[in-house]
Regions:
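Short glycine-rich, low-complexity/disordered patches
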Residues: 40-42, 87-96, 129-130, 173-179, ...
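A broad, low-amplitude sensor of folded, mature protein cores
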Residues: 3-9, 14, 114, 162-179, ...
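Extended serine/threonine-enriched, polar tracts that run as long, contiguous segments within proteins
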Residues: 127-202
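OB-fold ssDNA-binding interfaces and closely related basic DNA-contact patches used
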Residues: 1-141, 248-249
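Residues that form generic nucleotide/phosphate-binding pockets
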Residues: 27, 31, 161-164, 214
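Long, highly charged low-complexity segments enriched in Glu/Asp and Lys/Arg with interspersed Ser/Thr
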Residues: 83, 91, 187-249
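Exposed alpha-helical structural elements
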Residues: 23, 153-161, 206-213
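Residue-identity detector for threonine
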Residues: 7, 50, 69, 87, ...
């Protein structure tokens, strides 16, 4: 990347720096050509831990953080169903959905009518199809969002936060949100990490205009996801059941 591009991208600071996204697109065309591109993924701890694991921009090592503060530029459902109980490996789910409406794979079809998407189809009263939510979070001073795969145990708190913002006329991509973790316990007595959401501030008019372009770009990116996008080369523990699962990118 040329010095000129670096200088142009750095003209504005914070979220307003995104006003230089035309320069960023040019830089990406140069630096990412021929590469398989995906956004960095935040990892949730097992056993009720309260620190996120975030990929470092400076090295291959991850950084531990007590909170993530940024703009949720886009979010969508991320459903994953495995016919056989996942025990490890680099295999995608048998069926996945990124809109919560239509499943891709086997059995596929209408998610609302799918028997695997009903409470009680899994262990206890859980669903065989894991219902998650993918959040794309843009932190201040950065040009790419990071992704957080929100597990079922955190969906209620996220839903309540969304409702609280909408009731005040605020869209998620117009506010700065702070996300932390607290230890919770499910009905089976298994501890897991539950996300907590808090409003920090409204974006300025300049920031909102800049972030809107990122939201559209991320939305287009998400529209091209397939069940194979659920593959990851590392396994995690399901924070609700303690099972080894395939995490979402």
């Amino acid at each position: 990347m040329s010095d000129k591009k670096n200088t142009e991208i750095a003209v504005n600071e914070g979220f307003a720096a995104l006003a230089n996204r035309d320069v960023l697109n040019e830089a990406m065309a140069d630096d990412c050509q021929g590469l398989e591109f995906s956004f960095d993924r935040v990892k949730l701890p097992a056993g009720g831990g309260t620190a996120f694991e975030i990929p470092s921009a400076e090295s291959d090592e991850s950084e531990m953080a007590k909170d993530i503060t940024g703009v949720i530029v886009y979010n969508h459902p991320a459903y994953a169903y495995y016919h056989d109980k996942y025990t490890g490996g680099n295999n995608p789910p048998d069926c996945g959905s990124f809109d919560g409406v239509t499943g891709i794979g086997t059995p596929g079809g209408n998610c609302q009518n799918c028997p695997y998407n009903k409470f009680g189809s899994g262990e206890g009263q859980s669903k065989l199809c894991k219902n998650k939510r993918m959040l794309y979070i843009l932190r201040e001073g950065e040009l790419f969002p990071i992704t957080l795969s929100l597990p079922t145990g955190s969906l209620k708190s996220f839903t309540n936060y969304v409702k609280s913002q909408l009731s005040r006329g605020r869209k998620l991509n117009q506010v700065v949100t702070k996300i932390t973790l607290k230890k919770a316990t499910n009905a089976s007595g298994i501890a897991f990490s539950q996300a907590v959401f808090a409003f920090e501030r409204m974006l300025t008019a300049e920031e909102r205009n800049a972030v809107a372009g990122v939201s559209e770009t991320v939305k287009a990116y998400a529209a091209n996801l397939t069940p194979a996008s659920l593959i990851d080369d590392e396994t995690l523990v399901d924070p609700e059941t303690g099972e080894i699962i395939e995490p979402l990118k």
